[in-house]
Amino acid sequence: MLTFRVIGDWDEDAVRVSWTASRLASNPRVERLIDTAWAGARQRKGIQLFDGPMCRLESFSATPTSLDLHVSRTSYRTFLGTNMSLGVVGSFGPSVLANPIGLSTSMQSSDGHLLLGRRNEAVAYYPGRIHPFAGAAEP
């Protein structure tokens, strides 16, 4: 299910991002799950992996005139092993999730069509699927 935590129309200077200490919870069992997920993805033929840096959303505050994002560092490897692994939240709770900030956009052509892309076959999740143009916030 898609959940929007906040929706608004903020000017560029009304959006502020600040670094904060990570509250990502971990333990040896979660680290083993991350290792296992990463090793499994690496073994899939044709998949290209890069453990790139990402911004984890720690908290936010929003008003009609401002949006403050408080972020910490996480990585693609942690994202793959937590957010993309079934059962992690049920077993360990949401505090173990990488929770990177995802960015998506929608574009409408002048003749009224919605522009979408097809994900590359070499990505670790949802390969070949139709998808909005998207990515993740990086430090």
Describe each model-derived feature in a short phrase.
Residues 1-139:
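N-terminal leader/linker segments that precede catalytic domains of diphosphate-processing enzymes
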